Amino acid sequence: MAKRPVLEDVLDDEIDNMDMDIAQFDPSLRTPIAPVQPGPQITRSQDQEPPLFPNFPHPEQDKSVERKDIVDPNKFSAEERAELKKFQIIYPCYFDKSRSHKDGRRVSESKAVSNPLAKTISDACRHYNLPVMLELDKTHPQDFGNPGRVRVLIKDNNKNGMPVDSRFKTKRAVLNIIADYLKTHPTTLASIGPKSGIPLPSEYETGFEPGEIPKVKGFKMNTIVPVHSELTIKHPMTKSIYDPEPEQPQVKAPQAPKQPKKKVMKIRG
């Protein structure tokens, strides 16, 4: 007898820790990262002493992320991978004012903002000297058009689970200070441009001007997204999706010859 399908409850924490990539849903997607998807990239901010990952670059606190600050997670040692599991995951949709808690928002509505980006969340953690990693290729399943997430170390298991910073003892406290930072650093088109600190794809290095994207009815989505988002209409691989279909010349069907009218003779009696 065939097995019946089984429904399984999935907790929010399980969703938060999923390694989600939009290209996994449909390998035929015409996006900047699919079907030829680049390897995952992680940028790392300044860490406290002693460094948790000695092989990582250590940029100065106020400097933007540069190419030399991007590391390949596939080169992590076993010890570094173990340390990475101690980090808490934070997604941009946690701060999206257009979302309800059911849709993924994790802060109060008064603290939420428009168009939150993972890069700005990473900047907030850097600002407060929290150990943080920016994963550009990871995506929340409810926010697939806004790629990027942050891993931040809040409690150190090597120190009996003590907070890394006594000012922020819980994840809730960290979310609130990030929300405050996002309020004072609103997302603009410059946030995704060449001066954002995120290296642009080669096709964007010259002549690229960031622009807002149109909202799709029924979707909770940013109007400003990272350039490697599948929703970026400027990319040559996705622009054709938004282009109108070319009009096909209409071919008139040949007309059948008119039938001669039948003559009817009426005879009066």
UniProtKB/Swiss-Prot annotation:
Amino acid composition bias (Low complexity), ranges on this chain: 248-258
Subunit note: Fungal signal recognition particle consists of a 7S RNA molecule (scR1) and at least six protein subunits: SRP72, SRP68, SRP54, SEC65, SRP21 andSRP14.
GO molecular function (one): 7S RNA binding
Main location: cytoplasm
Regions of compositional bias (Basic residues) in chain numbering: 259-269
Protein name, entry field: Signal recognition particle SEC65 subunit
GO cellular component entries: signal recognition particle, endoplasmic reticulum targeting
Organism per entry: Debaryomyces hansenii (strain ATCC 36239 / CBS 767 / BCRC 21394 / JCM 1990 / NBRC 0083 / IGC 2968)
Family from the record: Belongs to the SRP19 family.
Gene name as annotated: SEC65
Lineage of producing organism: Eukaryota, Fungi, Dikarya, Ascomycota, Saccharomycotina
Matches recorded under InterPro entries: Signal_recog_particle_SRP19, SRP19-like_sf
Localization annotation: Cytoplasm
Record's keyword annotation contains RNA-binding: yes
